[in-house]
Amino acid sequence: MIYIQRRENRELETVDEFPTLKEARAMLIEYRISDRTATYYLSRRPCKHWRENQ
């Protein structure tokens, strides 16, 4: 799985997951366009809270 992480003011949050890198890259662009106040990037690991909520 590939995860999209959101970082803003030292806060880290996993916002989405995708089975393929191609899908994740396409959505990463959308996240970056829709919210310019945070930094979005791809990761192979989710944040701790993501695993707890799944």
Place the predicted regions along the sequence by residue.
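N-terminal acidic leader/helix
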Residues: 1-30
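Short, mixed-charge low-complexity intrinsically disordered segments
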Residues: 13, 25, 29-54
